[in-house]
Amino acid sequence: MREVTIAAIQMSCSRDVKENIEKAAKLIRAAAEAGAQIILPSELFERQYFCQERRYEYYAYAKSVQENDAVQHFTQTAKELGVVIIVSFYEKNINVLYNTVTV
């Protein structure tokens, strides 16, 4: 049987998307260096968690998979490190919003 090491990352997030992506990147790299092959950052880690309530202003956070900075960044990071990174993001597809996971 093959052994697989999985890392789950729980981190505090700020309102600064770029800062949160950079923080997650450091933690993902540390997990990969420690031997993790599958890495799962916190749910919707790009921002402070906002899903407790439905507010119109949150709809602006949603982006398509192609426009999402975290998805694009961690697609490249996964290739570079040779690991699987599971990224949760708020997706907009036409006029429908999803809490999506991409691998």
Model regions: which residues?
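Cys-nucleophile CN-hydrolase/nitrilase-fold catalytic domain and related Cys-dependent amidase chemistry
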Residues: 17, 29-103
